[in-house]
């Protein structure tokens, strides 16, 4: 991680009472980064799986984040997870009440509330200052086993699908992931990411490079199939040409034709002619990342989607190859 890793680990080895005193002192000194990193490690404790009403002093209503999210994406998910950690560490019961422009709670469209069965109606309800959070996973953490364990722990505890989402994803997963199949998962981004090359974000591999790497890893892992996660129809066609009868996909809409023909700037501006389009795009995206996390191995560019799949996988891939090509300048 960095030079402070040993300090953070040491603080988390302290007895609970002493840990809380050190944490409170760091809060008073405005050492927010240290506090949030310590809290992230502290969340590995199984006690957070068994919290009860008496463990919370108030309810924290999370109504905003770092950005005004218009739809579900992984930045939103990681932002909310960071705020959940911040709330729980301060003995506040988190309730995510972040709504989009249509008045829909983005979190509840797909997930259960954290500690959904706990209610503390007689205690104060506070509104979160959602912009005050530092504990985001960095792009480099996708290839660090200890950080995958930390964030994977949060995904396992708090990214709990609601009934409708779970039924949809379970059925799609059942159609793709089977005991007699060995599958290499491949994620390949395009559209706005490769067109805009957002500054500070990881450089994405060329299609030819990801095709070559997929072929190499298929042989190494003895995989018969590739599960392909992409929003680009041209990528799908290239993979089917290179690997005929070996490509598996779930239900999705491809964005590239609409993206190019509509003079659009960002993928969020692509819309399909169907009811509840934003919700369905989020559901299909989330399902594809979950299926990707269940493959035997992964080959991917470094992006929010591949990061989420790696965290969901929790260091269980037989092979994890993430292209490290630096950042867009």
Residue ranges and their predicted role:
Residues 72, 81, 283-328:
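A donor-sugar binding/catalytic signature common to diverse glycosyltransferases
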Residues 57-64, 76, 83-127, 297, ...:
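PAPS-dependent sulfotransferase catalytic core
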Residues 68-78:
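A short, glycine/small-residue-rich beta-strand->loop->alpha-helix junction that serves as a flexible
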Residues 102-107, 194, 232-238, 329:
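Short, charged/polar "capping" segments at the starts of alpha-helices
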Residues 8, 12, 16-58, 99-223:
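Secretory-pathway luminal glycosyltransferase catalytic domains
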Residues 187-193, 221-276:
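Catalytic donor nucleotide-activated moiety binding site of glycosyltransferases and closely related
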Residues 203-206, 274-279:
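Short, flexible loop segments at the rims of nucleotide/cofactor-binding pockets, characterized by
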Residues 76, 96-99, 187-188, 228-232, ...:
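Short His-Asn-centered micro-motif
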